């Protein structure tokens, strides 16, 4: 490897892992083939003896026993999954201060596959742009299912280490309709290649890396819990656009939008594409309305607004996610009623993509108010002032009624019941039809 000095180091402590603990027997290989042990001079750091500008040849072992046991947070480190091994690359590499690309070559059994976001430059030979791209991603080795998607400028690779053949058969039909729908919503999507790993872990969780994303579920993948895993995958994929390309300048103030709009669009998408029934979509919407209503009513949350909830996303999860869904639904419905159905929340997202996603600019709360008002054709600052920046309860019944649904709500008990209106207005019928999609069942 290239070296500008004798400094050697691993990635910094992250995800509950001290990566240097896994590096064993680090040694420098001399020109004559002999080796010289390099002792650690501090956690995660060694110093090799060499002249400036020299190339350095190292050998070391990596103790992967940490990946043998299921544990919370294993998606941030590694996990052995039957015939495959998922590893966050921080566990593998000792680095130098030399800048520039890093070439990686693997010597593996011929039957083994490799999935990684690094650029493949030859068979089993890859290139990472720098130390960060080298380590802040994952690699999967072994035998595992892979699903690919390639349309227009978007290429996506989904890897499923440890997933059974039956589970694979359930997962595969999800990706194409979801991604087609997202590309329809964002036709301006710039060229990119996304990498997702999805497997059974100790918890239901997700972790984003530099060029890759990992999702884990603690439950089996089955038709009975389809709403859970379809929602999880559709939600995290949508974050490529909302949160990945549309980057907020004030994350704490806009978490309700980043998470709530993402959750709303994910649920709407799996309903519109026929992956779940309208009944399941309504049950999911009921759950979000229930959590939002309870959050608005319960004493521990009385001093928090939707805008302020992002300051403690875990504690205020009912606001950030469920409240965000209700706000997104009401905003979508308001845009459609004000424009006679000619504009929707999609138009707002497309405008934001044009102004921020494609320019690299971040957006703030004031930008959102301005953009939403522009799309709707009326000033929506009062909507954001009352329901987002202050604690006035969103008009859930009105929003649902405008979309062709009846609702019975009991705020203090968190018990909403949503049903289809028997005789909706023409406007409500069209809003409901757009929500349910062609493939609604």
Residue ranges and their predicted role:
Residues 298-370, 378-381, 387-394:
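Pan-zinc metallopeptidase signature
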Residues 3-15:
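Ligand-binding face of N-terminal immunoglobulin V-set domains in extracellular IgSF glycoproteins
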Residues 17-76:
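A surface-exposed beta-strand-loop module
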Residues 14, 59-141:
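Extended, low-hydrophobicity, Ser/Thr/Pro/Gly-biased non-transmembrane segments
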Residues 19-29, 63, 90-91, 99-116, ...:
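Zn2+-dependent metallopeptidase catalytic core
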Residues 145-254:
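Juxtacatalytic substrate-recognition/specificity segment
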Residues 1, 357-441:
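Beta/coil-rich, acidic/histidine-enriched accessory regions frequently appended to metallopeptidases
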Residues 250-325, 338, 354-359:
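Acidic/His/Gly-enriched intrinsically disordered linker/tail segments
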């Amino acid at each position: 490897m290239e070296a500008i000095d004798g400094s050697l180091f691993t990635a910094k402590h992250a995800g509950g892992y001290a990566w240097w603990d896994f590096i064993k027997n680090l040694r420098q290989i001399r020109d004559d083939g002999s080796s010289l042990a390099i002792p650690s001079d501090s956690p995660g750091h060694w110093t090799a003896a060499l002249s400036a500008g020299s190339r350095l040849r190292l050998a070391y072992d990596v103790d992967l026993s940490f990946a043998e046991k299921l544990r919370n947070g294993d998606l941030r480190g590694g996990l052995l999954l039957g015939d495959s091994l998922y590893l966050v690359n921080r566990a593998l590499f000792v680095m130098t201060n030399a800048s520039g690309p890093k070439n990686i070559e693997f010597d593996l059994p011929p039957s083994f596959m490799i999935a990684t976001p690094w650029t493949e430059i030859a068979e089993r030979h890859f290139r990472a742009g720098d130390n960060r791209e080298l380590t802040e991603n994952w690699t999967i080795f072994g035998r595992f299912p892979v699903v690919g998607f390639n349309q227009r400028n978007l290429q996506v690779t989904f890897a499923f280490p440890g997933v059974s053949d039956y589970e694979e058969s359930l997962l595969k039909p999800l990706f194409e309709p979801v991604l087609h729908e997202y590309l329809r919503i964002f036709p301006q999507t710039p060229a990119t290649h996304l990498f997702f790993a999805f497997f059974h872990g100790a918890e239901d969780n997700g972790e984003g890396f530099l060029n890759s994303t990992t999702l884990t579920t603690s439950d089996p993948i089955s038709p009975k819990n389809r709403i859970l895993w379809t929602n999880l995958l559709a939600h995290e994929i949508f974050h490529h656009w909302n949160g990945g390309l549309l980057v907020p300048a004030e994350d704490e103030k806009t978490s309700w939008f980043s998470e709530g709009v993402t959750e709303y669009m994910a649920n709407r998408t799996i309903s519109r594409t026929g992956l779940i029934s309208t009944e399941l979509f309504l049950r999911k919407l009921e759950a979000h309305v229930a959590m939002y209503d309870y959050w608005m009513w319960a004493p521990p949350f009385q001093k928090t607004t939707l805008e302020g909830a992002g300051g403690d996303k875990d504690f205020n999860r009912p606001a950030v996610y469920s409240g965000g869904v209700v706000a997104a639904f009401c905003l979508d419905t308001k845009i459609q009623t004000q424009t006679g159905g000619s504009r929707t929340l999609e138009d707002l997202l497309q405008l934001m993509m044009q102004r921020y996603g494609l320019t690299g600019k971040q957006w703030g709360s004031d930008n959102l108010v301005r953009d939403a008002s522009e799309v709707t054709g009326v000033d929506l600052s009062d909507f954001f002032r009352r329901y987002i920046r202050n604690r006035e309860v969103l008009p859930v019944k009105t929003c649902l009624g405008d979309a062709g649904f009846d609702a019975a709500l009991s705020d203090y008990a968190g018990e909403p019941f949503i049903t289809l209106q028997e005789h909706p207005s023409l406007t409500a019928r069209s809003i409901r039809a757009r929500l349910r999609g062609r493939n609604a069942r």
